[in-house]
């Protein structure tokens, strides 16, 4: 992921100035990386090393989303709607 794209995502999903660690920002960054890796794996079907990394990222994202769901359901709903997750 390019630095400019990462900074754009952080600005877009930050809850306050200088926020880089909130669940919203972390989930947005993970989603971007997951989408990029999905495109890579469509071309390179036998890249099992990257596939494992993808599964690890999906698991981490799921954990962050579960945390957010338990602690603040409104922020959770807003985030999944903005990211287009959970159709």
From Swiss-Prot:
The keyword rRNA-binding applies. Keywords: Ribonucleoprotein, Ribosomal protein, RNA-binding, rRNA-binding. PROSITE patterns: RIBOSOMAL_S15. Residues 1-22 are annotated as: Disordered. GO terms for molecular function: rRNA binding; structural constituent of ribosome. It comes from the Bacteria. InterPro entries: Ribosomal_uS15 (IPR000589), Ribosomal_uS15_bac-type (IPR005290), uS15_NS1_RNA-bd_sf (IPR009068). Residues 1-19 have a biased composition (Basic and acidic residues). One of the primary rRNA binding proteins, it binds directly to 16S rRNA where it helps nucleate assembly of the platform of the 30S subunit by binding and bridging several RNA helices of the 16S rRNA. Forms an intersubunit bridge (bridge B4) with the 23S rRNA of the 50S subunit in the ribosome. Belongs to the universal ribosomal protein uS15 family. This is Small ribosomal subunit protein uS15.
């Amino acid at each position: 992921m390019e630095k400019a794209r990462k900074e754009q995502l952080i600005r877009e999903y930050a809850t306050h100035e200088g926020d880089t660690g909130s669940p919203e920002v972390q989930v947005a960054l993970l989603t971007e990386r997951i989408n990029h890796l999905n495109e890579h794996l469509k071309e390179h079907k036998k890249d099992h090393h990257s596939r494992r990394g993808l599964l690890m990222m999906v698991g981490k994202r799921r954990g962050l989303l579960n945390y957010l769901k338990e602690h603040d359901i409104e922020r959770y709903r807003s985030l999944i709607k903005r990211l287009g997750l959970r159709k």
